[in-house]
Amino acid sequence: MKTTNLILSLAILGFSFISCKQETEINTTVVDFEDVAMNPDSISKTSSFISGNSNFSINDDAFWNGGIVSSSHNDTVTIGYKNQYSSITGSGALNSKQYGVVYSPGSFTCPANINGTYSIKSMMVTNSTYAYLDMKNGSVYGKIFATGDWFKVIIKGFKTKVPTSNVEVYLADFRDGKSILLKTWKKIDLSALGQVDSVTFAFDSSDKGQFGMNTPAYACIDNIEFTQTISIK
C-alpha cells in the first residue's frame, strides 16, 4: 500500500512539474521604415520618430549634427550634399519605398519591454548616392577611389550603456585586388552584437585630409531584424 501511494505521489509531482514548466517562443520584429508617415520624395517630418520597436532622431534638431532620418528620396544621379537623402539603389531594400539614412554620428534605441531586451539579428545596408558618387567620380574634397582605398561603417551595440560588440561593413573596398563599391542592398549579420537597447554608427575611410575623413560619412539602412524570447503559459 505504501509503495502504491509513493508511486502515485511521484506521478502527481511529475505531472505538476510538467504542467507548470514555462514554454517559450521566438518573436521577430523588423524595422522597415514603411510605418513612418511621410510624402513621396521627402524625409521624416520631425526631428525624432518611431519605426517598429525602435526610436530614431537627428542630433540637436539638425541633420548636419548627425543622426538618422527616414527617407523616400530616389535620386541616383545628382552629385553633392544636396542629394544627401537618397540611396544609390533608388529605393529601400527589396524595392520598398522608405528607408533610413545615417549621417555620422548616428544612433537609435530599441528599449526593452515586458519581455526583456531585444537581440539584433541583421540589417540591410547600402551606400548613399552622395557617398557613392563621391568615391566613384571624386569631388573637391574626396578622391576617386583606387587600389588600396576603403570606406566602412562600424555598427556597435550597447546594453545599458555597456558595449556588447561591433561589426564593420565595407561600403567600398579596393584592397587586395578587390574593386567593390556597394551599389545594392546587402544583408549584414549582426548577431554578434547580441542583446542590445541601443546601436551606434561610426565611419572610417582611407581618404583622409587635414580635417579628417574626406569621404561623406553616410550610409542607408533598412529591414533591421530583431528577435526576442517570449514566455508562453
Label the predicted regions:
Residues 40-42, 128-133, 207-210:
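Short catalytic/ligand-binding loop motif for oxyanion handling, primarily in non-cytosolic enzymes
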Residues 107, 121-137:
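Secretory/extracellular carbohydrate-interaction modules
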Residues 134-153:
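Short coil-to-beta strand junction motifs in C2/discoidin
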Residues 153-233:
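Terminal, low-complexity interaction segments
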